[in-house]
């Protein structure tokens, strides 16, 4: 289990200057040839997303103005807060900020031939399934994971196991991304 606070994470500027990324975790750890990766991105200006051939992306707008995403050959979609949207990393995708507002989003990328991410927003206590990787990010409220208390802009990632996330207040929201391995793959096989 790895815990994080995005306010204390290193920032990497995008090559096109349109935003910045804070990498949360990847599997296998510390490699460019990952099977899955989670990050938080701040988008400051209109521009193209980087292409990631062989990957599926799920993007969830966390804060800021809506973002219109356009792929000339495939889709036109407006990202709204806390509504995950999946698309192929192979596509050229242009991002247009609504009213020029800076936006922050959660990104999970998975290698198409080995695993898949399911992203959802939780508002009550829940337990994850065993033997799957996952990432949680606190949007609001106070949550407990094991003996650790997590608050806004904090989270955790893991590569397997069963975990209970307990909401300690009457209201709260948490982004949860579960990683499911495709048949023939498991965390033990790809490290």
UniProtKB/Swiss-Prot annotation:
HAMAP family, alphabetized: Ves (MF_01591)
InterPro entries: RmlC-like_jellyroll (IPR014710), RmlC_Cupin_sf (IPR011051), Uncharacterised_HutD/Ves (IPR010282), Uncharacterised_Ves (IPR023482)
CDD domains: cupin_HutD_N
Gene3D superfamilies, per database record: Jelly Rolls
Family according to the record: Belongs to the Ves family.
Identification of the protein by name: Protein Ves
Domain of life: Bacteria
Disulfide bridge map: none
């Amino acid at each position: 289990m790895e815990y994080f606070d995005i306010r204390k994470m290193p920032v990497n500027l995008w090559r096109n200057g349109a935003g910045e990324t804070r990498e949360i975790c990847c599997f296998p750890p510390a490699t460019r040839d990952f099977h899955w990766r989670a990050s938080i991105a701040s988008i400051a200006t209109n521009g193209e997303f980087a292409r990631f051939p062989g990957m599926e992306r799920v993007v969830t707008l966390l804060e800021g103005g809506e973002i219109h995403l356009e792929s000339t050959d495939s889709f036109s979609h407006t990202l709204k807060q806390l509504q995950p949207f999946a698309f192929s990393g192979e596509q050229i995708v242009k991002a247009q900020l609504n009213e020029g507002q800076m936006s922050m989003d959660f990104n999970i990328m998975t290698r198409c031939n080995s695993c898949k991410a399911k992203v959802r927003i939780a508002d009550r206590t829940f337990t994850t399934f065993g033997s799957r990787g996952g990432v949680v990010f606190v949007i609001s409220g106070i949550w407990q994971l094991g003996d650790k208390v997590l608050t806004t802009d904090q989270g955790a990632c893991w590569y397997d196991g069963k975990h209970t996330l307990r909401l300690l207040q009457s209201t709260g929201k948490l982004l949860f991304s579960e990683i499911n391995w495709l048949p023939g793959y498991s965390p033990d096989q790809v490290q």
